[in-house]
Amino acid sequence: MEKIRKNFGFGCMRLPMIGEDVDIEQTKQMVDCFLEQGFNYFDTAHGYLQGKSELALKECLTSRYPREDYVLTNKLSGSYIKKEEDIRPFFESQLAACGVDYFDFYLMHSQSTTNYQHYRDCRAYETAFALKAEGKVRHVGISFHDRAAVLEQILTDYPAIEVVQIQFNYLDYDDVAVQSRKCYEVCRRHGKPVLVMEPVKGGSLVNLPDDAKAVLDALHGGSPASYAIRFAAGFPGMLMVLSGMSSMEQMQDNLSYMKDFTPLNNAERTAVSKVVEIFRKQDLIPCTSCRYCTDGCPKHISIPDLFAIMNTKHTHHDWNADYYYEDVHTGPGSRASDCIRCGQCERVCPQHLPIRQLLQDVAKEFEKG
């Protein structure tokens, strides 16, 4: 962990795209800017962009910079392994895809009650600790999406876990379902450094309702993202706050306030609390656009995009939402009403959303004709 230079990391789940492919030239520019400004932590996973994230990092980062210049985190994704014997070949394929001979951090991906049992059955933790002993992994940790009691159980079962990545932002801090604060407190009790994901909640804390945006604008300070990321970074024990940046503009904004980080002051914390109150009064879908739900959807429904359109209509009363629903994000056989209720999406959703019911709500809103 001593290699980490600053507490802000480049999350590589939302890289800039040109059509279906990663925008390699812009990603190279972003990697260069990130390293030049003194930051060096990169986070990926095989499932990010259907494997293209790992390959992009090889082309934009690992083939262009010495290994000691960056910290690279990858994850063991349970959907790619069926048994213990699958783990090492999968791990070696990740090393090859990323163009490295070791990972600084290797996380058991998206741990929850269901996933955790699968990892135990496959002896995934034991294999990861063995990889560390062999020098192929420097630190073993988990990324986590569930209730605090489940996290407590995992850290009790495997005290050798070194770091925990949790969803943490000011909107989820006291949320009953996500339990960010309670999960953070479990990490602190166990003495585990915390890696923060979703500090802007998939963009929800950037694209604010108009009245919430007005509260932050009155501070005459930074961008909406700056308050969200600084909120997360300001807690003790936060080793890293990740941001899934998809443009140079986003990166430059983030680096401007994280290069010489300062926690939120009292006025800023009060403003953030007001924003939370505004959100609580709105009936928004708490989707973070991770897109885990779309890979296995037999109807190819663009679930996160439909939820985003629904939120946009409720938040901004935007008539354009109907256009985007009809002409951009749906097609024959892939509208919300085409859901066959198989439940595949709900089994992989880190937010545990009732997606089938929500799609019915979307259909009711946009398919009135």
For every predicted segment, state its role:
Residues 18-19, 32, 36, 81-200, ...:
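Glycine/proline-rich, positively charged
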Residues 25, 32-35, 39-40, 59, ...:
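Structured C-terminal cap/extension of enzyme domains
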Residues 48, 64-84, 109:
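Structural motif corresponding to the early beta-alpha repeats
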Residues 53-57, 147-152, 251:
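Short, well-ordered alpha-helical microsegments
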Residues 58-71, 125, 158-164, 255-261:
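Short, electropositive alpha-helical surface patch
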